[in-house]
Amino acid sequence: MPELLTPRLRCSPLQLDDWSFFLSLQQDPQVMLYVADNRPIADIRAAFDARLPLWSPKSSHWLCLVVRDRQSHTPLGLTGYCHHDDDIAEVGFLFAPQAQGLGYGYESLCALCDYAFSTGGIRRLTASVTAGNQASKQLLLKTGFIQEGELRESYWLHGRWHNDWLFGLMRHDYQ
């Protein structure tokens, strides 16, 4: 399983002892505003457990990496991707409120893209972002993703339908 290193970060596979951090992200209204409604702990635990099995480049489950400060080992967020086709994968990321706006998302997403394109056998990365989530949109654009479209009223969240913004990044376009 990959471990990605950047000057400030260590991104390593989710482990059993990451449960409390995973739960704290999933229960934080600010973090989950554009992601999901409140869920029972049992549902969050099922999502956590689904990300624990050993991952390899052709796995059908999410590669889930805990983004940590490289010196203090403090967990800051999660990043990863999931294959949808042979050489296409969807990226995702969540960061704790205190870790937002400090460049950790960009640094870890660049490391993830580097890995996906150089080692993971990925030709195309995609992302789906709930419309209105400007921070995620800006992060994806800064990383080189292109907004390719918008799905109207495609995601049910907080009691109403929301549009989804669709992003893509091709290996040959990635710098």
Regions found by a protein language model. Give the residues of each.
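Short loop/turn motifs at secondary-structure junctions and domain boundaries
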Residues: 55-60, 145
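Acyl-donor (CoA/ACP) binding surface of acyl/acetyltransferases
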Residues: 1-33, 66-175
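Conserved GNAT-fold acetyl-CoA-binding loop/helix
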Residues: 30-52, 65
